[in-house]
Each structure stands twice: as structure tokens, then as C-alpha cells.
Amino acid sequence: MAGIRALFMYLWLQLDWVSRGESVGLHLPTLSVQEGDNSIINCAYSNSASDYFIWYKQESGKGPQFIIDIRSNMDKRQGQRVTVLLNKTVKHLSLQIAATQPGDSAVYFCAEN
């Protein structure tokens, strides 16, 4: 992850039926969705000179895993089930996950370079 200037936000995405316990201590923004629903995770940035944005996910007990990236000269980039949208005017990007599955339960990070 060399060259990453800032880590903007992280979000715990969980399927409603997956988590039955209570979390103690760290309170992360949480998005709970039903299996099969679409999810949207938003991220804001402040450095208008940023030209490269990356989304990672980190499953419990594992290291961060690259999901998708986008360059500042693009508005949209699509993967297999994920799409990233970049709005440079308002310095905002979003990660859309189609047909959410149990394997999507993770902490999500957005970063700039």
C-alpha cells in the first residue's frame, strides 16, 4: 500500500442474518442489507489533486483485499459485481455492490493516492 496518502472511511457491511452477536468498543458506521439487495457505500475526499482512488475490503481475521480502483479522468468503473462512481465536483466516490452475498460482509476502506 505504498504511496497511499489518506484512508478516508471504513464501513462494516453485514448481512442482517449473518451477525447475531453484539459489538463492544469500536463503533464503525454500519450498513445492514438483506442478501440479494444492492449496497452503496459512500466516501468523501478533500484533496482536489488526488488522481487515483482505491476501494479495499477486509474480512474478519484477514488483511485488506483490493476490490476496485478508479482514476480521476473517469466517472465510472465497473467490475464483476462492483461499480465505483467518482464525482470530482463534490469530491465524492461511491462503491456499489450488486446482489449482496454473505461473502461481502467486511470492513470497507476507501483511499486516495
Curated annotation (Swiss-Prot):
Signal peptide per UniProt: 1-21
Annotated InterPro entries: Ig-like_dom, Ig-like_dom_sf, Ig-like_fold, Ig_V-set, TCR_variable_domain
SUPFAM superfamilies found in the cross-reference section: Immunoglobulin
PROSITE patterns documented for this protein: IG_LIKE (PS50835)
GO CC field: T cell receptor complex
Cell location: Cell membrane
A Pfam cross-reference name: V-set
GO biological process assignments: adaptive immune response; response to bacterium
Glycan attachment points: N87
Protein's job: V region of the variable domain of T cell receptor (TR) alpha chain that participates in the antigen recognition. Alpha-beta T cell receptors are antigen specific receptors which are essential to the immune response and are present on the cell surface of T lymphocytes. Recognize peptide-major histocompatibility (MH) (pMH) complexes that are displayed by antigen presenting cells (APC), a prerequisite for efficient T cell adaptive immunity against pathogens.
Complexes and interactors: Alpha-beta TR is a heterodimer composed of an alpha and beta chain; disulfide-linked. The alpha-beta TR is associated with the transmembrane signaling CD3 coreceptor proteins to form the TR-CD3 (TcR or TCR). The assembly of alpha-beta TR heterodimers with CD3 occurs in the endoplasmic reticulum where a single alpha-beta TR heterodimer associates with one CD3D-CD3E heterodimer, one CD3G-CD3E heterodimer and one CD247 homodimer forming a stable octameric structure. CD3D-CD3E and CD3G-CD3E heterodimers preferentially associate with TR alpha and TR beta chains, respectively.
Protein name, entry field: T cell receptor alpha variable 13-2
